[in-house]
Design a protein with these regions (language model features):
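Canonical P-loop GTPase G-domain recognition
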Residues: 131, 137-197
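Conserved beta-strand segments of the P-loop GTPase G domain that flank and frequently precede/overlap
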Residues: 56-57, 108-111, 133-136, 172-173
Length: 266
């Protein structure tokens, strides 16, 4: 459903005269670390469009669905002149707040029936979503979509708003039949207009830069730490001790912390 929606949405933007970049974060295998990288092949028309750029990126095991380099790739796409940059997440419904901190507008794409509508509510996606879109409003699914829409709208009324300037909207569409796609784009424009007028969008962008620096700093510190042979060896010994139940995880953490303190700060 995601790829069909993205292609319909991307082609609409191109017809509006915009250049579109899609960063399709692909699920990585927890066993081999490899990724499927098949999203591009499922968006044939968009992949062939001159005004579109699609880049599959492995998620590298990040629960939030965002690759470590997805943020940098977004900036590169903006610098290259793409008007709209779309980040497609793994869609596992876990820790998607990581993605919400990377983008200006976060859209949660749902389908009615099968428990997905309830999942969206339970997993807290509504708290970070700026727009909720229920896809597959076609065929015999109209009743399910109407019920799901009512559930989401009712839930949104009791949740605290993410922004004072914006009340999240629930929209429906059929990517297969190309219906409702333009309403989604108009809602995104309304969202951007509201946040720009209040100055909130600038604050969001500033926070994105701060968040990027924080994440990259953590990554660099860990890289330097594990590049130290003494720490790497001590860390592996600690892991083995915890695995063999000769050391509790809490004690292991304390000992690692003391080792770092001795090596780098004393």
């Amino acid at each position: 459903g995601k790829s069909t929606f993205l292609e319909a949405f991307g082609m609409l933007l191109i017809r509006e005269g915009l250049k579109v970049a899609v960063i399709a974060v692909d699920p990585s295998s927890p066993v081999t670390g490899g990724s499927i990288l098949g999203d591009k092949t499922r968006m044939n028309d968009l992949a062939r469009a001159e005004a579109a750029f699609i880049r599959p990126v492995p998620s590298s095991g990040h629960l939030g669905g965002a690759s470590q380099r997805a943020g940098e790739l977004m900036l590169l796409c903006e610098a290259a002149g793409y008007d709209v940059v779309i980040v497609e997440t793994v869609g596992v419904g876990q820790s998607e707040t990581e993605v919400a901190r990377m983008v200006d507008c976060f859209i949660s794409l749902q389908i009615a029936g099968g428990g997905d509508d309830l999942q969206g509510i339970k997993k807290g996606l509504m708290e970070v979503a700026d727009l909720l879109v229920i896809n597959k409003d076609d065929g015999d699914n109209h009743t399910n979509v109407a019920i799901a829409r009512h559930m989401y709208e009712s839930a949104l009324h009791i949740l605290r708003r993410k922004y004072d300037e914006w009340q999240p909207r629930v929209l429906t569409c059929s990517a297969l039949e190309k219906r409702g796609i333009d309403e989604i784009w108009h809602a995104i424009i309304d969202f951007k207009t509201a946040l720009t007028a209040s100055g909130r969008l600038q604050q969001v962008r500033q926070q994105q830069s701060v968040e990027w620096l924080r994440k990259q700093t953590e990554e660099e510190v860990l890289n330097h730490l594990f590049a130290n042979e003494d720490f790497d060896r001590y860390y592996r010994q600690t892991l083995l001790a915890v695995k063999n139940n000769t050391l509790s995880p809490r004690t292991g953490l304390r000992q690692l912390s003391e080792f770092i303190q001795t090596q780098y700060f004393d």
